[in-house]
UniProtKB/Swiss-Prot annotation:
GO cellular component terms, A-Z: cytosol
Protein name per the record: Pantothenate synthetase
Residue sites binding (R)-pantoate per the record: 62, 156
HAMAP family: PanC
Quaternary structure annotation from Swiss-Prot or TrEMBL: Homodimer.
Membrane-traversing stretches: none
Note: The reaction proceeds by a bi uni uni bi ping pong mechanism.
C-alpha cells in the first residue's frame, strides 16, 4: 500500500530506514494533476531504484504574475490513487509553509545562469529560478539516489542537470521520453484547458516539429526552417513564443551537422503549450 507523507520528519524517517536496508531511492517531482506521462516517470524510476517517492507540490515561485497558479488543478486524491496503481511507494505532499517557511516572497532563491535565461526563461522571467529553488529543496528533503524528469520540459531538464553538476548533488538525473496521445499531442496537464474545437488544432505543434526535422535533414537553412514553422503555427491560429532549432545544449548552432532539438512554445487561445523533438 502506498504511503503518504505531509510531515517532513516522518518522510525522512522512512527514507532513512530504506537506506539502512541498502535500498536505492528515486524521486519523481510533480505538481500533481497527474496523467499517463507522469505515470511513465514512475515506471521508469522503478528501473533505477528499489523505492520510488513522488512529490506533489504546486510551486508558486515558478509561476509568473499573469500565469495560472490559482487556476492550476489540484487533484491529490486521484493523483495518489493513480500513483499507487503504477507502483509508487510513497507520496510527499508538502504545504507551501513547509516548503517556504520564511514565506514565498522572502525565500532564498536559486539561479542557474545561461541555460535558464533563453527560450522559456526569456518568455517567463524567473520561472527557472523557481524550478531550481523547489527542486533543490526536494533533493535535500528526500535525498534520492536518482531523480526522473520528463523530456517534454527539455529546457527544465537541462537547467536541473546544470544545477546538479555545479552543486555536486550526488544524484543521478534521468530524462524520460515524451508520452504522446495517438494523434501526436504531448500529454500535458494543460491539455484539459483546450476546447473541443482547439484539441485537434493543437496537434499542429507535433506536425510542425516533424516538419522542422524534415527541413534539417533536407539541408534547409535554420532561418528558413524556423520561419516556416512559425508561419505554419500562426496559420493554424497559434500565438507563437518561439519555434527554434538548437543544439542539445540549447545553444544556437554555429555549424551544420550534429544533433539538434526543435523546440516550440505557442499559445492556442489562453492555453500555452510546449513541445520538442530531438534528432
Amino acid at each position: 500500500m502506498i504511503q503518504t507523507f505531509n510531515e517532513l520528519g516522518a518522510l525522512r524517517e522512512q527514507i532513512a530506514q530504506w537506506k539502512r536496508e541498502g535500498l536505492r531511492v528515486a524521486l519523481v517531482p510533480t505538481m500533481g494533476n497527474l496523467h499517463g506521462g507522469h505515470h511513465s516517470l514512475v515506471t521508469l524510476a522503478r528501473q533505477y531504484a528499489d523505492k520510488v517517492v513522488a512529490s506533489i507540490f504546486v510551486n508558486p515561485t515558478q509561476f509568473g504574475p499573469n500565469e495560472d497558479f490559482s487556476r492550476y488543478p489540484r487533484t491529490p486524491e486521484a493523483d495518489v490513487a493513480g500513483l499507487e496503481q503504477v507502483g509508487c511507494d510513497a507520496v510527499w505532499l508538502p504545504s507551501v509553509e513547509a516548503m517556504y517557511p520564511l514565506g514565498v516572497d522572502k525565500t532564498t532563491q536559486m539561479h542557474a545562469p545561461g541555460v535558464s535565461e533563453v527560450l522559456e526563461g526569456a518568455s517567463r522571467p524567473g520561472h527557472f529560478d523557481g524550478v531550481c529553488t523547489v527542486v533543490a529543496r526536494l533533493f535535500l528533503q528526500v535525498q534520492p539516489d536518482v531523480a526522473v524528469f520528463g523530456r517534454k520540459d527539455y529546457q527544465q531538464l537541462a537547467v536541473i542537470r546544470q544545477m546538479v553538476a555545479e552543486l555536486s548533488f550526488p544524484i543521478q538525473i534521468v530524462g524520460a521520453d515524451i508520452v504522446r496521445d495517438e494523434d501526436g499531442l504531448a500529454k500535458s496537464s494543460r491539455n484539459q484547458y483546450l476546447s473541443a474545437e482547439q484539441r485537434p488544432v493543437a496537434t499542429t505543434i507535433h506536425r510542425t516539429l516533424l516538419g522542422m526535422r524534415e527541413g534539417y535533414v533536407a539541408g534547409q537553412a535554420r532561418d528558413r526552417i524556423e520561419a516556416d514553422a512559425t508561419a505554419a503555427l500562426q496559420a493554424a491560429g497559434f500565438q507563437v513564443d518561439y519555434a527554434v532549432l538548437r543544439t542539445p545544449e540549447l545553444a544556437e548552432p554555429t555549424f551544420d551537422g550534429g544533433g539538434r532539438v526543435a523546440l516550440i512554445a505557442a499559445r492556442l487561445g489562453s492555453t500555452r503549450l510546449i513541445d520538442n523533438l530531438e534528432f
